[in-house]
Design a protein with these regions (language model features):
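Short loop-beta-helix segment that forms the pyridoxal 5′-phosphate
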Residues: 100-103, 119-139
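N-terminal entrance/gating region of PLP-dependent enzymes' catalytic architecture
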Residues: 35-112, 298
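Gly-rich Lys/Arg/Thr-decorated short loops/hinges at beta-loop-alpha junctions or inter-strand turns
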Residues: 90-101, 119-124, 149-150, 170-174, ...
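Flexible, glycine-rich loop/tail regions that form catalytic "lids" or insertion modules at the edges
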Residues: 38-41, 53-56, 76-77, 333, ...
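Conserved PLP-enzyme active-site core in the AAT-like
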Residues: 15, 106, 136-284, 348-351, ...
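Noncatalytic alpha-helical scaffolds and linker/capping helices
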Residues: 401-402, 410
């Protein structure tokens, strides 16, 4: 029983002495007092019945009747009800990594099918079984390109999602990688490991890029591939994609997931889990994690990544979404999202609101006199009108969830503006 008891004072003192500290406080002195958690201001205990009443009372404060035209990386997409029913089964709802293939065939098969679907969507040879999100996918893609090219400089478009850029700065700073940000791809790219672009970019614009003399990384929202060419057809060597739009609720920002996909020759530099299909000793089909020498099973500093495994649950959500929607349903959702965006843009133009994009999918930038007043007017009518970019520009997005009536409400509200 001794092994399960908390440390006594003598043990704590011995541990502190062994690392050269005088007290527990010394362990946390680098953390400013202002950043430390104080005493929790909790209410008095309640019975289960009273607690249910209290939670319902709090829930009434939620605003659930807003219509959303907000995008910027997270979108209000249709989520089939069956997804949560399957994904929340105890067999799947776990952070466990399926190392014991003999007891995890279901999980491994889902991972394998997910990877297959991602390869079909991106046109690439191989895809991993998720990373955290699109931002980490971009950052990991840069690290991957640097390992492949053995060059320490990369080119990154300024028109990437700003949050992606922040994550990239963190990863590259920590790894001593030099990043140059561009508006237009330079003529000479041979001295760089890779060029990273987002298609469509953060502002919704679909831009064609010329061929480069280094590795090409294309970042995208996976739902855009319901209509656009695959990244492979665009000339990508590595694809970094966010997959929140494959059946994942917005969830106040997460959890979501991203993926990395690449050409087969770069497979051993691909971070994250990889599920493979083989046959067992009896000749039956079997699934297992494969090519694991890329991961933390080897020396940490030589591993391609130390990504955790629980994002595979979000990969399951994406697999279920694509299975339920089917190819036709997936394409229809994409077409409807794009149709709604272009319909809204056209109706706004008739009211004198200019769209700044030339080519876009479901997201575009509009020019207004006063962005704050513009968005506040919409919000007063229970419409979340978009993301303020600056005093005169607003980023607007639509999905298949926006009805024609909601688009008319958006435009009608501005007629009063």
């Amino acid at each position: 029983m001794k092994n399960f008891l908390v440390h006594d004072e003598n043990t704590r003192a011995e541990m502190l002495e062994s690392i050269g500290l005088k007290g527990i406080e010394d362990l946390f002195k680098q953390i400013p007092q202002t950043a430390r958690m104080g005493e929790l201001n909790l209410e008095k205990p309640l019975s289960e019945m009273d607690l249910q009443k209290r939670i319902k009372q709090i829930a009434k404060e939620n605003k659930t009747d807003y219509v959303s035209f907000i995008g910027g990386g997270i979108y209000n997409k249709f989520v089939p009800a069956a997804i949560s029913q399957v994904a929340n089964r105890f067999e799947f709802l776990t952070a466990y990594t399926p190392y014991q293939a003999e007891v995890a065939q279901g999980t491994l098969q889902i991972m394998y099918e997910f990877q297959t679907m991602m390869c079909r969507l991106t046109g690439m040879d191989i895809a991993n079984a998720t990373v955290y999100d699109g931002a980490t996918a971009c950052a990991e893609a840069i690290l991957m390109a640097v390992r492949i090219a053995k060059k320490n400089k990369v080119l990154v478009s300024k028109k990437l999602n700003p949050e992606y850029l922040q994550v990239i700065k963190t990863y590259t700073w920590a790894n001593g990688i030099e990043v140059e940000y561009f508006d237009e791809v330079p003529e000479n790219t041979a001295d760089y490991a890779a060029v990273l672009v987002q298609i469509p970019d953060y502002y919704g614009e679909i831009t064609e890029f010329k061929a480069v003399d280094c590795l090409s990384i294309i970042c995208c929202d996976i739902s855009t591939l319901s209509i656009l060419k695959t990244p492979a057809e665009m000339g990508a060597d590595i694809v970094a994609a966010d997959i929140q739009t494959l059946g994942m609720p917005m969830n106040f920002g997460g959890p979501h997931a991203g993926i990395l996909a690449c050409k087969e020759k770069y497979m051993r530099q691909l971070p994250g889990r990889l599920a493979g299909r083989t046959v067992d000793a009896d000749g039956n089909q079997a699934f297992t994690l494969t090519i694991q020498t890329r991961e933390q099973h080897i020396k940490r500093e030589k591993a391609t990544s130390n990504i955790c495994s629980n994002q595979a649950l979000m990969g399951l959500w994406a697999t279920l979404y694509l299975s339920l929607m089917g190819e036709d349903g997936f394409r229809q959702a994409g077409h409807l999202s794009a149709k709604n965006a272009h319909l809204l843009s056209e109706k706004l133009a008739k009211k004198g609101v200019k769209t700044l994009n030339k080519n876009f999918f479901n997201e575009f930038v509009i020019e207004v006199e006063d962005a704050d007043e513009f968005l506040n007017r919409l919000k007063a009518n229970n419409i979340l009108g978009g993301i303020k970019l600056d005093d005169h520009r607003v980023l607007v997005a639509t999905t298949e969830m926006n009805s024609a009536e909601e688009i008319d409400r958006y435009v009608a509200t501005l007629a009063e503006f």
